[in-house]
Amino acid sequence: MEKVLVTSTSEVYGTALYVPIDEKHPRQGQSPYSATKIGADAIADSFYRSFNLPVTIVRPFNTFGPRQSARAVIPTIITQLLAGKTEIKLGAIHPTRDLLFVKDTANGFVEIAKSDKTIGEEINIATSSEITVGDLAQKIINIINPLAKIITDDIRLRPEKSEVERLFGSNKKILEITNWKQNVSLDEGLKLTIDWFSKPENLQRYKAEIYNV
C-alpha cells in the first residue's frame, strides 16, 4: 500500500511541559518555523480524516550526522574546532536535546512506511534521552581538542520566548507499532560525524568563522 509520510518536527512541542514528550503533548508554536509545521501537520491530518488519504505524520527529534547544515549546533561546534579555534562560540548551552543519528532517523521513516499500523498516526522518532547543549559541546571538545573552551556569543542566542528549553522525546509508540530501534549511540554517531567532517574535501564546504542563521 502506498502511504504519504509527512515530515514534522519535535519543535512543534515547544519547551517540554512534561517528559518524555509523547505524541499527545500540546503543540506550542514558539517560532515561525514550528508554527508553520503545526499548520502543515493539521492539514495533513485533515486529508486523512476527510479523504481517507493514507497519511502518517513522522516527528523526528534532533537529527545529526555527516553533511548536516552549518546552521545546526553539532556542525557549528565541529567546524570551529577543526578550524583550530580554541574559543568555541555558541548561544545558550543549558537547553536539552534528544539527538538521533541520521541513519536511525532514516530507518525510522522506512519502518513507519512498512508498518500497517501507522496510517493516521503521529509518530515520534526519538531516543528517549536528553543532553544539554553544553555537555554535548564538551563531548565534542574532548574528542577534538580538550584545551578548547565554550564562550557565549550573544548573536547566537534565540529570543527568550522562542528558545525551546527542553526536548526529550518518548519513543514508546514507534517501538510498539514498528520494528524500529536505535542502532547508533550518541557517542558512536559523534565519532562518525567528526570523521566525516575531518576529511578536507568535506570540511572545505563549511566556513567556521561565519555564523549561519
Which stretches of residues belong to each language-model region?
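N-terminal Rossmann-like NAD(P)+-binding domain of SDR-like oxidoreductases, especially those catalyzing
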Residues: 1-63, 192-198, 202, 206, ...
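Glycine/proline-rich active-site loop of Rossmann-fold NAD(P)-dependent oxidoreductases
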Residues: 38, 63-76, 83-86, 102-103, ...
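Hydrophobic alpha-helix immediately C-terminal to the catalytic Tyr-X-X-X-Lys motif of short-chain
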Residues: 39, 43, 47, 77, ...
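Generic structural signal for alpha-helix termini and adjacent loop/cap motifs
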Residues: 50, 80-84, 112-116, 177, ...
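A short C-terminal helix-loop "cap" of Rossmann-like NAD(P)-dependent dehydrogenase/epimerase domains
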Residues: 51-54, 78-89, 115, 143-155, ...
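Substrate-binding strand-loop-helix patch
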Residues: 66-71, 94-106, 122-142, 183-185, ...
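C-terminal "lid/loop" region of Rossmann-like NAD(P)-dependent oxidoreductases
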Residues: 92, 121-123, 132-137, 145-166, ...
